[in-house]
């Protein structure tokens, strides 16, 4: 999709493999029959709306304590797991063993279900055949380097009719060989007794798990396994995910035995499964634990759910009920108080535990075995209601378990996601899902103190995926089911998991540790603006209007002109523009040394030629520059800055074909000369065109239009550069370049060679496309020319790159005085063969979103180390040139405390500092993007559209004052005072200076008037007193004396 950013801000077409899309894709893989079954559950879901119970886990949704997205506890954690952490991988017998009719194995309920319910699936003989190719499985385990292997015993392979009366010798031999091989390799076996493949005989004879007789039969089977294998097995799982056994086996019909619509059966089966597990645990605890010293649990699975509004208690309670009705259904009796959650017991369908049974059931697990995978999220309408959202947040559900069940030790006994069946070894999305899940586990251990002691990646091999049969794959190893030898080929996810195991987590590799240091004192610290819209008339007409006005204070309070009176006026001044005054105040707050903005070509030359020049607009821009220089802020001026919504060309030029017409290049030269002549004495840094490698995207009707427009843009830039070099540089002593959009590219899958090539190809098509002709060879990159030619030969493209004539090659080569780049993010690319008539298809590149990385609201990934790699790549390919980062920033929706932007600035400046100090890249300036924001665009601005400063303003100004990231005890930078503290009162005085001046004048005048009034009042009293004395009669012999 297209982002809503301008050409100066990041915007492109993205492919997002988000969790929501993955859920959608998972639902699409289900058969129509399975989807229809889900409709039966509409009545069941109503039961979950009952209120009454509120467990401790409900606190997990209380987000009143806001946690910043850039808080270390919320970011991807580069750290390692505890030293004794266990790494494993798992399989299910029915999924991988195959050979369902071989060596005496009896049929299971799933064998019948496959043939009766799953159309087009010819049994499990297409499976991985682990029963036959045991050695290949062991080699796969050796490749990964796991410390344990979790597998299940096939009950019908060991006991074909389900009872322990007659063991199948061949099946017994297979499991003994497997266990012996694991012990020999020092791989700990974790054995699951029941992973859904119930012997068919028990289903037909007893009705399966609906019959309580299964409790004793299961205990007999478990006892035999303990006796036979217990000397080599220290970890036992009784049942894998009983919720799915009960709910999908007897409620939705999505699993064997395929019964549906009977809630009584659903809860009866769940009840019997809990009691069966409990009986086996007590059996092991009493009879086998004393000498085998093992541990036993049951694997419980769940989804995770989030309320739409955490301040809506009803939504929160419904989320709690949703978790309790899935995970709590089994966890509460076993890990809790021995009984079902209270709100579930309000219905008459669920069985009751007697007090003795509660005591029997409670505490029958030595650790909490937890499953978190796609089966727990299907179908979505069984776990999601109005006001809720499904989430793949494994960390949160682990916290919920900790709160609900008294901080148990946890083994993640199943975790992973799926890919479509056509994916072979390049399972790139599976890598990111694993990375996300594993890091959430690490965060839970490190930040939340959750006691996770092991992780089971699911699954070792591609195999039968239950209701999805063979339409999805979950294995770390690819298996061609139609081949005879069933070779195990490691997928990218296998390589990745192997690396995780070797590193014991996520040690920091992508970047060196943070460092302290400064940029030089002449470093340009700037801020970038897009097109600066001019004021066509002065905002304040004070002293420019010759008329005198009287304010009618008693009537309508309007101003009335006094006829016949004319006042002396003065010419308008730069300070008369209110917008300039506001802009200068913003620049002063930021303490920048440079300000980059773009001129509006359409306003300066509305007709596109010199026949009509808007001098008022030129004067406005000159005022912007001059007022900034008074403040010590130097300009970098862009002549032409198109955006996605506006090409920025005068209408006559646009009507005549725009950049597809070479006349536009001539018009651009005339326009540039006018700007050099009118503003060049004040401007020393010029950008001709902003992001021409993105502007060409506007001419995307065909790839040839794109390449032609880009070619003409390059010619236009070169002509302007030569014009400046010849006529204006000797006098104005400035520098001219153009700015390129330069995002870095990384292979989305580092284990696939084609992704590495795609990443380099992206850089060639995106950056070298313009950089090679201008900085290097005078011609397009050879990689670009050869790749397009190759696609043409194969009929996959009709693109034709324009050719530079010898004259044009000489014209464009070397027409840059510095390297100006706009960098925003790092793209993770995959090779994808495309066949359209658009230029982007010539790259054969698509993007993948790394869900583990901090991203902005517009999905820009925060990958600071990418800018350092980019700078090193530029230095390596285009020699040691002066480089200006002319735009670097991110969108942040916060109107005041924009924490993502502050984090972004700090980390990207950190990486630029490393490039300068360690890699010796000649970085001359850093310009943050951008000064102000527009109401209709993502919020990239330091100031809001009504000029209110965000907290990033002060943060960036401190970076500038420190000239980087110095150590705390270092001396002040570049003549700065020892303490550069933020003076709130000083800022207020500066901002309110006119009002304060007026107030002082008013108070002074008031004081003078008051003094005069008091003086005259006292004088009058003296005079009155004197007159009174004259009227008093004198005594005889006295005379009046007047002084």
UniProtKB/Swiss-Prot annotation:
Transmembrane segments annotated in the record for this chain:
995-1015
Q: What residue spans carry the region label Glycosyl hydrolase-1 2?
A: 515-965
Signal peptide coordinates: none
**GO molecular function terms here?**
fibroblast growth factor binding; fibroblast growth factor receptor binding; hydrolase activity, hydrolyzing O-glycosyl compounds
Q: What's a single GO BP term from this record? A: positive regulation of MAPKKK cascade by fibroblast growth factor receptor signaling pathway
The membrane topology noted for this protein in its Swiss-Prot or TrEMBL record is: Single-pass type III membrane protein
In terms of Pfam families, this protein maps to: Glyco_hydro_1 (PF00232)
**Parts of the chain on the Extracellular side:** 1-994
Gene Ontology terms, cellular component aspect? membrane; plasma membrane
Q: Does the keyword Transmembrane apply?
A: yes
Chief location bin: membrane
Q: Which segments carry the region annotation Glycosyl hydrolase-1 1?
A: 77-506
Which residues are sugar-modified?
84, 122, 161, 211, 262, 308, 389, 552, 609, 700, 704, 837
- Tissue and organ expression note: Present in liver, muscle and white adipose tissue, but not in kidney (at protein level). Expressed in liver and pancreas, and at lower levels in skin, stomach, skeletal muscle, small intestine and lung.
Which InterPro entries does this entry report, sorted A to Z? Glyco_hydro_1, Glyco_hydro_1_N_CS, Glycoside_hydrolase_SF
Keyword check for Transmembrane helix:
yes
Give the record's keywords alphabetically: Cell membrane, Glycoprotein, Membrane, Repeat, Transmembrane, Transmembrane helix
Instruction: Extract the SUPFAM superfamilies matched here.
Output: (Trans)glycosidases
The residue spans the entry assigns to the Cytoplasmic side of the membrane are as follows 1016-1043
Domain characteristics, as noted in the entry: Contains 2 glycosyl hydrolase 1 regions. However, the first region lacks the essential Glu active site residue at position 241, and the second one lacks the essential Glu active site residue at position 887. These domains are therefore predicted to be inactive.
Role, per record? Contributes to the transcriptional repression of cholesterol 7-alpha-hydroxylase (CYP7A1), the rate-limiting enzyme in bile acid synthesis. Probably inactive as a glycosidase. Increases the ability of FGFR1 and FGFR4 to bind FGF21.
Could you give the subunit structure recorded for this chain?
A: Interacts with FGF19; this interaction is direct. Interacts (via C-terminus) with FGF21; this interaction is direct. Interacts with FGFR1 and FGFR4.
Q: Which family does it belong to?
A: Belongs to the glycosyl hydrolase 1 family. Klotho subfamily.
Q: What is this protein called?
A: Beta-klotho
Gene encoding the protein: Klb
């Amino acid at each position: 999709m297209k982002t809503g950013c301008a050409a100066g801000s990041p915007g492109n077409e993205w492919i997002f493999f988000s969790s929501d899309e993955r859920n959608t894709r998972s639902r699409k893989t289900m058969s129509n029959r399975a989807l229809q079954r889900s409709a039966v559950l509409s009545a069941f879901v109503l039961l979950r709306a009952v209120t009454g119970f509120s467990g401790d886990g409900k606190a997990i949704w209380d987000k009143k304590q806001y946690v910043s997205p850039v808080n270390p506890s919320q970011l991807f954690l580069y750290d390692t797991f505890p030293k004794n952490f266990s790494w494993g991988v798992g399989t299910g017998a029915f999924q991988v063993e195959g050979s369902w009719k071989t060596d005496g194995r009896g049929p299971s309920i799933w064998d019948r279900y496959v043939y009766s319910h799953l159309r087009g699936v010819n049994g499990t003989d297409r499976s991985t055949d682990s029963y036959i190719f045991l050695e290949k499985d062991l080699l796969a385990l050796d490749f990964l380097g796991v410390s344990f292997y979790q597998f299940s015993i096939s009950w019908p392979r060991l006991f074909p009719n389900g009872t322990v009366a007659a063991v199948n010798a061949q099946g017994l031999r297979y499991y003994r060989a497997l266990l012996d091989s694991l012990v020999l390799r020092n791989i700990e076996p974790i054995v699951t007794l029941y992973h859904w493949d119930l012997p068919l005989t028990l289903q037909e004879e007893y009705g399966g798990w609906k019959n309580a007789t299964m409790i004793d039969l299961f205990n007999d089977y478990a006892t035999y396994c303990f006796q036979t294998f217990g000397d080599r097995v220290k970890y036992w799982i009784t049942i894998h995910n009983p919720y799915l056994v009960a709910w999908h086996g007897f409620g939705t019909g999505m699993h064997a035995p395929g019964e549906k619509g009977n809630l009584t059966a659903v809860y009866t089966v769940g009840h019997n499964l809990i009691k069966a597990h409990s009986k086996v645990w007590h059996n092991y605890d009493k009879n086998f634990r004393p000498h085998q010293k093992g541990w036993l649990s049951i694997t419980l699975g769940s989804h995770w759910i989030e309320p739409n509004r955490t301040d809506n208690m009803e939504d929160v309670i419904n989320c709690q009920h949703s978790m309790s009705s899935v995970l709590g259904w089994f966890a509460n009796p076993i890990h809790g108080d021995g009984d079902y959650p209270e709100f579930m017991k309000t219905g008459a369908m669920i069985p009751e535990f007697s007090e003795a049974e509660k005591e029997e059931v409670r505490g029958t697990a030595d650790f909490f075995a937890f499953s978190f995978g796609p089966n727990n999220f299907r179908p979505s309408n069984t776990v999601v209601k109005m006001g809720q959202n499904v989430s793949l947040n494994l960390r949160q559900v682990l916290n919920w378990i900790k709160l609900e069940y008294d901080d148990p030790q946890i083994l993640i006994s199943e975790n992973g996601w799926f890919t479509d069946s056509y994916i072979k070894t390049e399972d790139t999305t599976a890598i990111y899902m694993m990375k996300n899940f594993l890091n959430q586990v690490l965060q839970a251990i490190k930040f939340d103190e959750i006691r996770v002691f092991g992780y089971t990646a699911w699954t070792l091999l591609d195999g039968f995926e239950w209701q999805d049969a063979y339409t999805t794959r979950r294995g770390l190893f690819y298996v061609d089911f139609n081949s005879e030898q069933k070779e195990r080929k490691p997928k990218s996810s296998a390589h990745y998991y192997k690396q995780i195991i070797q590193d014991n987590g996520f040690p920091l590799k992508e970047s060196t540790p943070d460092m302290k240091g400064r940029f030089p004192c002449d470093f340009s610290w700037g801020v970038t603006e897009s097109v600066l819209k001019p004021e066509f008339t002065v905002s304040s007409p004070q002293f420019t209007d010759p008329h005198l006005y009287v304010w009618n204070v008693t009537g309508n309070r309007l101003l009335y002109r006094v006829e016949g009176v004319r006042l002396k006026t003065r010419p308008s001044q730069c300070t008369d523009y209110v917008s300039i005054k506001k802009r200068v105040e913003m620049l002063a707050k930021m303490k920048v040394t440079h300000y980059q903005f773009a001129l509006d070509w359409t306003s300066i030359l509305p007709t596109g030629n010199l026949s009509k020049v808007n001098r008022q607009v030129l004067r406005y821009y000159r005022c912007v520059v001059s007022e900034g220089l008074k403040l010590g802020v130097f300009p970098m001026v862009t002549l032409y800055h198109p955006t996605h919504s506006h090409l920025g060309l005068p209408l006559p030029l646009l009507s005549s074909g725009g950049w597809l017409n070479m006349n536009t290049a001539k018009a651009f030269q005339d326009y540039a000369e006018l700007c050099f002549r009118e503003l060049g004495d004040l401007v020393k840094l010029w950008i001709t065109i902003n992001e021409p490698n993105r502007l060409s995207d506007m001419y995307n009707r065909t790839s040839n239009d794109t390449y032609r427009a880009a070619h003409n843009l390059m010619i236009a830039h070169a002509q302007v550069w030569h014009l400046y070099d010849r006529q204006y540089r000797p006098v104005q002593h400035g520098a001219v370049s153009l700015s390129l959009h330069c995002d870095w590219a990384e292979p989305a899958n580092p284990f696939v060679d084609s992704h590495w090539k795609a990443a380099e190809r992206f850089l060639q098509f995106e950056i070298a496309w313009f950089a090679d002709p201008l900085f290097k060879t005078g011609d397009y990159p050879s990689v670009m020319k050869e790749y397009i030619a190759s696609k043409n030969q194969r009929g996959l493209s009709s693109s034709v790159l324009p050719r530079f004539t010898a004259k044009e090659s000489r014209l464009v080569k070397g027409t840059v005085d510095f390297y100006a780049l706009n960098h925003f993010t790092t793209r993770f690319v995959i090779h994808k063969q495309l066949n359209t008539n658009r230029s982007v298809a010539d790259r054969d590149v698509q993007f993948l979103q790394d869900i583990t990385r901090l991203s902005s609201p517009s999905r820009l990934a925060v990958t600071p180390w990418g800018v350092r790699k980019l700078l090193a790549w530029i230095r390596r390919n285009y020699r040691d040139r002066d480089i200006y980062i002319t735009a670097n920033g991110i969108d942040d929706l916060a109107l005041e405390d924009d924490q993502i932007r502050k984090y972004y600035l700090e980390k990207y400046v950190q990486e630029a500092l490393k490039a300068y100090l360690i890699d010796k890249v000649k970085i001359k300036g850093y310009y943050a993007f951008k000064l102000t924001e527009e109401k209709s665009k993502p919020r990239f601005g330091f100031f809001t559209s009504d000029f209110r400063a965000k907290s990033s303003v002060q943060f960036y100004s401190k970076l500038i004052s420190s000239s980087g990231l110095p150590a705390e005890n270092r001396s002040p930078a570049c003549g700065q005072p020892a303490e550069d503290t933020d003076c709130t009162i000083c800022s207020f005085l500066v901002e309110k200076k006119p009002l304060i001046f007026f107030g002082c004048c008013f108070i002074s005048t008031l004081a003078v008037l008051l003094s005069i009034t008091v003086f005259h009042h006292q004088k009058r009293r003296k005079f009155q007193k004197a007159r009174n004395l004259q009227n008093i009669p004198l005594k005889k012999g006295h005379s009046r004396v007047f002084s």
